[in-house]
C-alpha cells in the first residue's frame, strides 16, 4: 500500500530533485499533481523546476558534504537525480542510511559516466555494443584511436547534451578532439571513451519503466541529433517486430541489472533487425519530451508513478507525434518570446522552460505536435518551433 502525505503538512511526502532543468520541471509538476512536496536543487538560481517547487536550494551537487547538508535539512523521502554530475558516492552513503535514491544509488553511480554503464552492458550483460576503448591521457587517447580506427567518436566519460564530443575522420583532428573532450566533461577534465562508428539505419530511445507491477515499454522514440544534441524526436519510430522484440529484451536486461523503480531512457542503434546498445539514463530523457503530447502518461508521469511505488497498469500511445526544440542563439538575462500565437493550435503545443538566461546557444523550449503521419507531425513541430521569436 502506498501512503501519500499532503504537501506543506507534517505528514507530507517530500521529493528532492537533484538537477532542476526542464526535465526536472515536468517531474516536479507531476509530483504536484499528487500533492507531493517538492524541493528543487541545482547549481544555479531560478532553474526551471525551482519555479514550480515548494522550496529550492543552490549548491554544488558534486560536493558530497553540501549534498548531505541539504538532505539533512529537508529530510526528503525520495531523492530524484535529474543529471549525471552529482556526488554519487554520497548518494550511496545516504541510501545505506535508509534514504530512497531514485531509481537506486547504484544506477546513478554506474550511469554517471559512460565507463560504468558500458562495462555493465558489454562485459557483464554481454549485450551488443560498439567497439570501445577508454583513455585518461592524450597519448593513450591516440593509441585508442589507432586501435579503433577511423572514423570514430570521442566523448568525455561524463558529459551531457553532446558536450565534448567529436566525430574523428583523420589524425589531423586528434589534438583538437582531445582538447575539446577535456573542456566538455561535466566534472572537468579527465577520462574519455573512444567508440567505433556503428552502421545503423536509425537511433531510438526506448523509454522503459520498472515499476511495482513489472517492466513496461513506451512505443519507440526516434530522434535526429545535431552537434550531439537532439533537434527533433518522434513517436512511434517504425521498426520490424523482430527488432522491437530485441530492443525490448536489451532494455529489460539493462533496467533490471541497474535496479530500482523509475523510468529509464535506453538508447539503441537499429540496423534492419539488429539492435546495438548505446547508452542508458536512469531518468526521463530529453527525446522523450514528445510523450507530453503522444501518450496518456508522459515519461515524467510514468517516472513519478513508478518511484512512488504505484502501478503503471498500461501506457496508451495516441498515434503519430513529434517534438522540435526551440534553440535560439543570443546573450540575455531577460529573454522574451514573440509570435507565440502562431506556434500553438489544434494538436499543437509548446513548452517554454523558463531558463533565467542564455549565453550562446541554449534549449529554451520545445514544440509538440500530432498529425496523421510521423513525417507530418515532425514538420508541424519544426514549423511551430520556428515561429517562436526569441529576443533578449
Swiss-Prot record:
<dbReference type="InterPro" id="IPR011054">
    <property type="entry name" value="Rudment_hybrid_motif"/>
</dbReference>
<comment type="function">
    <text>Involved in the de novo purine biosynthesis. Catalyzes the transfer of formate to 5-phospho-ribosyl-glycinamide (GAR), producing 5-phospho-ribosyl-N-formylglycinamide (FGAR). Formate is provided by PurU via hydrolysis of 10-formyl-tetrahydrofolate.</text>
</comment>
<feature type="binding site">
    <location>
        <begin position="195"/>
        <end position="198"/>
    </location>
    <ligand>
        <name>ATP</name>
    </ligand>
</feature>
<feature type="binding site">
    <location>
        <position position="267"/>
    </location>
    <ligand>
        <name>Mg(2+)</name>
    </ligand>
</feature>
<feature type="binding site">
    <location>
        <position position="155"/>
    </location>
    <ligand>
        <name>ATP</name>
    </ligand>
</feature>
<dbReference type="InterPro" id="IPR048740">
    <property type="entry name" value="PurT_C"/>
</dbReference>
<dbReference type="InterPro" id="IPR005862">
    <property type="entry name" value="PurT"/>
</dbReference>
<keyword id="KW-0436">Ligase</keyword>
<keyword id="KW-0479">Metal-binding</keyword>
<keyword id="KW-0658">Purine biosynthesis</keyword>
<dbReference type="InterPro" id="IPR013815">
    <property type="entry name" value="ATP_grasp_subdomain_1"/>
</dbReference>
<dbReference type="GO" id="GO:0006189">
    <property type="term" value="P:'de novo' IMP biosynthetic process"/>
</dbReference>
<protein>
    <recommendedName>
        <fullName>Formate-dependent phosphoribosylglycinamide formyltransferase</fullName>
        <ecNumber>6.3.1.21</ecNumber>
    </recommendedName>
</protein>
<dbReference type="InterPro" id="IPR011761">
    <property type="entry name" value="ATP-grasp"/>
</dbReference>
<keyword id="KW-0067">ATP-binding</keyword>
<dbReference type="GO" id="GO:0043815">
    <property type="term" value="F:phosphoribosylglycinamide formyltransferase 2 activity"/>
</dbReference>
<dbReference type="Pfam" id="PF21244">
    <property type="entry name" value="PurT_C"/>
</dbReference>
<dbReference type="Pfam" id="PF02222">
    <property type="entry name" value="ATP-grasp"/>
</dbReference>
<comment type="similarity">
    <text>Belongs to the PurK/PurT family.</text>
</comment>
<feature type="binding site">
    <location>
        <position position="279"/>
    </location>
    <ligand>
        <name>Mg(2+)</name>
    </ligand>
</feature>
<feature type="binding site">
    <location>
        <position position="355"/>
    </location>
    <ligand>
        <name>N(1)-(5-phospho-beta-D-ribosyl)glycinamide</name>
    </ligand>
</feature>
<feature type="binding site">
    <location>
        <begin position="362"/>
        <end position="363"/>
    </location>
    <ligand>
        <name>N(1)-(5-phospho-beta-D-ribosyl)glycinamide</name>
    </ligand>
</feature>
<dbReference type="InterPro" id="IPR003135">
    <property type="entry name" value="ATP-grasp_carboxylate-amine"/>
</dbReference>
<dbReference type="GO" id="GO:0004644">
    <property type="term" value="F:phosphoribosylglycinamide formyltransferase activity"/>
</dbReference>
<feature type="binding site">
    <location>
        <begin position="22"/>
        <end position="23"/>
    </location>
    <ligand>
        <name>N(1)-(5-phospho-beta-D-ribosyl)glycinamide</name>
    </ligand>
</feature>
<feature type="binding site">
    <location>
        <position position="114"/>
    </location>
    <ligand>
        <name>ATP</name>
    </ligand>
</feature>
<dbReference type="Pfam" id="PF22660">
    <property type="entry name" value="RS_preATP-grasp-like"/>
</dbReference>
<dbReference type="InterPro" id="IPR054350">
    <property type="entry name" value="PurT/PurK_preATP-grasp"/>
</dbReference>
<feature type="binding site">
    <location>
        <position position="286"/>
    </location>
    <ligand>
        <name>N(1)-(5-phospho-beta-D-ribosyl)glycinamide</name>
    </ligand>
</feature>
<feature type="binding site">
    <location>
        <position position="203"/>
    </location>
    <ligand>
        <name>ATP</name>
    </ligand>
</feature>
<feature type="binding site">
    <location>
        <position position="82"/>
    </location>
    <ligand>
        <name>N(1)-(5-phospho-beta-D-ribosyl)glycinamide</name>
    </ligand>
</feature>
<dbReference type="GO" id="GO:0000287">
    <property type="term" value="F:magnesium ion binding"/>
</dbReference>
<comment type="pathway">
    <text>Purine metabolism; IMP biosynthesis via de novo pathway; N(2)-formyl-N(1)-(5-phospho-D-ribosyl)glycinamide from N(1)-(5-phospho-D-ribosyl)glycinamide (formate route): step 1/1.</text>
</comment>
<dbReference type="GO" id="GO:0005524">
    <property type="term" value="F:ATP binding"/>
</dbReference>
<feature type="binding site">
    <location>
        <begin position="160"/>
        <end position="165"/>
    </location>
    <ligand>
        <name>ATP</name>
    </ligand>
</feature>
<keyword id="KW-0460">Magnesium</keyword>
<dbReference type="GO" id="GO:0005829">
    <property type="term" value="C:cytosol"/>
</dbReference>
<feature type="domain" description="ATP-grasp">
    <location>
        <begin position="119"/>
        <end position="308"/>
    </location>
</feature>
<dbReference type="InterPro" id="IPR016185">
    <property type="entry name" value="PreATP-grasp_dom_sf"/>
</dbReference>
<keyword id="KW-0547">Nucleotide-binding</keyword>
<comment type="subunit">
    <text>Homodimer.</text>
</comment>
Amino acid at each position: 500500500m502506498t501512503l501519500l502525505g499532503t504537501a506543506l503538512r507534517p505528514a507530507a511526502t517530500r521529493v528532492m530533485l537533484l538537477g532542476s532543468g526542464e526535465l526536472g520541471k515536468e517531474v516536479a509538476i507531476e509530483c504536484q499533481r499528487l500533492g507531493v512536496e517538492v524541493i528543487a536543487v541545482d547549481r544555479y538560481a531560478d532553474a526551471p523546476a525551482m519555479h514550480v517547487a515548494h522550496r529550492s536550494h543552490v549548491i554544488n551537487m558534486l560536493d558530497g558534504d553540501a549534498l548531505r547538508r541539504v538532505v539533512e535539512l529537508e529530510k526528503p523521502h525520495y531523492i530524484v537525480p535529474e543529471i549525471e554530475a552529482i556526488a554519487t558516492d554520497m548518494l550511496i552513503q545516504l541510501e545505506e542510511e535508509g534514504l530512497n535514491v531514485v531509481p537506486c544509488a547504484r544506477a546513478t553511480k554506474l550511469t554517471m559516466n559512460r565507463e560504468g554503464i558500458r562495462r555493465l552492458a558489454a562485459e557483464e550483460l554481454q549485450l551488443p555494443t560498439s567497439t570501445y576503448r577508454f583513455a585518461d591521457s592524450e597519448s593513450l587517447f591516440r593509441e585508442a584511436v589507432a586501435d579503433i580506427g577511423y572514423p570514430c567518436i570521442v566523448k568525455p566519460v561524463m558529459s551531457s547534451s553532446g558536450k565534448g564530443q567529436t566525430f574523428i575522420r583523420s589524425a589531423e583532428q586528434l589534438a583538437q578532439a582531445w582538447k575539446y573532450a577535456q573542456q566538455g566533461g561535466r566534472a572537468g577534465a579527465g577520462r574519455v571513451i573512444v567508440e567505433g562508428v556503428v552502421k545503423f539505419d536509425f537511433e531510438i530511445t526506448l523509454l522503459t519503466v520498472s515499476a511495482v507491477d513489472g517492466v513496461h515499454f513506451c512505443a519507440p522514440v526516434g530522434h535526429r541529433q545535431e552537434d550531439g544534441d537532439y533537434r527533433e524526436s518522434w513517436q512511434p519510430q517504425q521498426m520490424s517486430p523482430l527488432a522491437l522484440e530485441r530492443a525490448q529484451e536489451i532494455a529489460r536486461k539493462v533496467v533490471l541489472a541497474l535496479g530500482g523503480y523509475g523510468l529509464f531512457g535506453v538508447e539503441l542503434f537499429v540496423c534492419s533487425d539488429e539492435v546495438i546498445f548505446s547508452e542508458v539514463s536512469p531518468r526521463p530523457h530529453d527525446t522523450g519530451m514528445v510523450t507530453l503530447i503522444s501518450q496518456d502518461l508522459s515519461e515524467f508521469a510514468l517516472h513519478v508513478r513508478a518511484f512512488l511505488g504505484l502501478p503503471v497498469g498500461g501506457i496508451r500511445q495516441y498515434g503519430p507525434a513529434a517534438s522540435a526544440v526551440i534553440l535560439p542563439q543570443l546573450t540575455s538575462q531577460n529573454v522574451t518570446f514573440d509570435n507565440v500565437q502562431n506556434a500553438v493550435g489544434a494538436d499543437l503545443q509548446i513548452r517554454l522552460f523558463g531558463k533565467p538566461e542564455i549565453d550562446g546557444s541554449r534549449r529554451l523550449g520545445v514544440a509538440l505536435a500530432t498529425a496523421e503521419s510521423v513525417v507530418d507531425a515532425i514538420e508541424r513541430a519544426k514549423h511551430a518551433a520556428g515561429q517562436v521569436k526569441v529576443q533578449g
